């Protein structure tokens, strides 16, 4: 079993993930990452033999709009992982997202992706933070 932490409204994320094959549990709470990143969202317990991080991220970006600035900074799009072996899959998905538009800048655990597929050829910026888990505090039952 593995864990992944995603920022966003817990109720919407729980609804999106609770029926996915390979997802064993979804718990709301606060996650803190090594790069001073702190998010409010969900902890996803999943079986990597049944679902991978890319599929989890695909579902995430169907629920969370990474182009809209959240009023609460804890709800800005972010991915917090437990193991460095998860980073290649997160970066693979980021490269997939990059291929949809202009090449982004990336630095210090933050991915800034441009999506040029908009009416009028405007470029929308998508900011996704990611970092390694330091602490997770689940919501009270």
PLM features: residue spans?
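Flexible coil/turn and secondary-structure edge motifs
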Residues: 1-141
